[in-house]
Amino acid sequence: MMRALNLVSKTTRGWLVGGIVFSGMLCGCHREPAPSPAEAARAAVRAATLRPADERLAALYDHSCRACHANAQANAPLTGDRAAWRSRLKKGNPELVQHVLMGFNGMPPGGQCFTCTTADFDALIAFMSN
């Protein structure tokens, strides 16, 4: 009898610990709230007008980044939309550059910038995320 109680107790403890761990994992699943239609429209207009001050960087942006990052239908984070970039920036610039280099979700490998260096990608990410 004592052995049966001990087994139930271990099983119950296992379920409790599993439930707590699972609950903790669910708490980590968080998405940024979707912007209102008006906010999304403002972000799209802003993204379409922004351009790096540095002419070389501006040429790289125009050639390789603008088509997706200034187009809301592309589902890429819009240039200048800090809220859209916030969760990505939390991953750190090295990981974001790795996503550019290797491709990630809709991002093509190399970001379609075959002449860009890692420093260029760092600068383009900094520009687009501010």
Predicted regions and their residues:
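Sec-dependent bacterial lipoprotein signal peptides
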Residues: 1-27
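Disulfide-bonded cysteine motifs in exported proteins
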Residues: 22-24, 60-63
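Bacterial signal peptide processing site
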Residues: 29-32
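Electrostatic cytochrome c docking/interface patches
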Residues: 35-59, 75-86
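Extracytoplasmic/secreted proteins, especially bacterial periplasmic and envelope-associated proteins
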Residues: 56, 60, 84, 95, ...
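The canonical Cys-X-X-Cys-His
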Residues: 61-71, 124, 128
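Gly/Gly-Pro-rich "capping" loops immediately C-terminal to redox-active cysteine motifs
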Residues: 70-98
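Axial heme c-ligation environment in periplasmic c-type cytochrome domains
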Residues: 78, 99-128
